[in-house]
Every structure is written in C-alpha cells, then in structure tokens.
Amino acid sequence: MLGPGQVRLRPRVWRDKAGGRVADGASGLPPARGSWRETGTGRALGASSPPRPAQGSSSPGIQSGPSSRPGSPRGAEQAGTPRPRLSLGISQATGSAARWRTRRTGKGLGYNSDEIRPRTLLIEHLMEGGRRDHHTMTVLWGTQEIIVAEFHKKIKEAFEVFDHESNNTVDVREIGTIIRSLGCCPTEGELHDLIAEVEEEEPTGYIRFEKFLPVMTEILLERKYRPIPEDVLLRAFEVLDSAKRGFLTKDELIKYMTEEDGVSLRRPG
C-alpha cells in the first residue's frame, strides 16, 4: 500500500544488444552508453539513461575514459582533459550526402558558395561569350570582305564607263556623275573635297583609278553621303525608259550617262 503523496515508480527497462531485457534493480547493469535502446521505441537513451556503475565495476561495455581517475568521485573530470567523443554512427552514404549538401550550401567550409557560384558562372559566361564574339567577328570580317569586293566591282564598272582611253583615268569633270551612279548624292562642297583628295599634287585634270578606288570604297562603307532619294531615282528611270518597258539595257545606261547634254529629270508632258 502507498501512503499519502507517494507515487509508484515504474522501473525503466532496456534491451541489450543480445535482445535480453535489463531493468532497474535487476541483477547486473545495463549495457554501455550509446547501445541502450528504450523498450518499444528503439530510441537511444541519453540524459535519461540509468546511472553509471560505481568505480571499479567490471560491467561489460563500459570503459573508463581519460576523465576518470582512481579514487576520484564518479563523473569528476581532470582539469584540461577533454571529454571522450562518442561515435555518432553515421553511415558512409549519410556522410557523403551531408558533405554534398555542405559543398552546395558552403556552410562550414570557410566560403560562401552563393558568392562563388555566380562568380564562376560569370567567368564561364564570359568565356562562352568570348568564343561567340570571336565566331561572330570572324563571320563579320568574312561578310565585310564580300561587301568590299562587291563595292570594288561596282566602282570599277562605273569608272570604266568614263575611261574612254582605257588607261585607268577619267576626266575630273566626270567624278560627280560616277559618284551619283553609285547611289550617292554629295553636296557641291562634299564633291569638291573628294576631288581635292583624289587629285594629283600637280592637277592634271584627270583622276587615276588607283587613287579613286580606296576613297570611294570608304565612302560607300561608311555611307558618308546621303543616298539619292527614291523618288528622284524613279523619276529619272521613267524619263530614261521612254518606251515604258520597265528596264534599261546596259548600252542605254552608258549612253545616257555619257551624253554631254545630260537628261532632264522633269516628268514628260
């Protein structure tokens, strides 16, 4: 019978590694700390584990750590001596997963991966961008070479129309017509500046193709002169195409361009 205020305490029961039940008050002592399992739960017992055996006990599974000294009270620790570390029992797979998570989060490794990863991505992006830019520049250079070759061809054809002596020279008075035939519409001042640039140091009244070609190529590439308005071109074509065929032959175009009197661009009728 329990008296007033008394409570019956249920003995705690542990299961040792062999599967046997060991309870408080039973013969012998529970197994070593770290291998206790509470009956029915399978959980390891920590702070609620049963008391350690007295000094000198030979119970299996209990080892005296460096903190125990003969004659000292149980649990007393030697000053400056670290307590022994207990194995956490982490499996290799769990440890690998933890290390992978640590690498991804950067925690505990002395750096912030949130800063390093974007920096790495930026470097990779710049490297990839550099390769793309190099490829793009290669294509652009190849395209420009094609464009320059086309310009050279057009300039040569327009120049040859007025090279009556076939000696790679034209009359300086024909330069304006040649430039306009290439789709440019310079002002009078721009035309005078160009002629001054391509003329010889001692003006002869003629312009050599070798000096005209690079200057005119640069003008076409940089589009220095405003283009001839489309309505002007259309009106000129309608005047020249008197038969209303919708096209002009090369001979007709040369004839019209080399006529001394020129052609009026006023609409007929």
Swiss-Prot record:
The lineage of its organism: Eukaryota, Metazoa, Chordata, Craniata, Vertebrata. The keyword Cytoplasm applies. Residues 150-185, 228-263 form the EF-hand domain. Its main location: cytoplasm. PROSITE patterns: EF_HAND_2. Keywords: Cell projection, Cilium, Cytoplasm, Cytoskeleton, Flagellum, Repeat. GO terms for molecular function: calcium ion binding. This is Dynein regulatory complex protein 8. The keyword Repeat applies. Component of the nexin-dynein regulatory complex (N-DRC), a key regulator of ciliary/flagellar motility which maintains the alignment and integrity of the distal axoneme and regulates microtubule sliding in motile axonemes. It is found in: Cytoplasm, Cytoskeleton, Flagellum axoneme. Signal peptide: none annotated. Residues 1-113 are annotated as: Disordered. GO terms for cellular component: cytoplasm; cytoskeleton; sperm principal piece. Component of the nexin-dynein regulatory complex (N-DRC). Residues 54-76 have a biased composition (Low complexity). Coiled coil: none annotated. CDD domains: EFh (cd00051). Belongs to the DRC8 family.
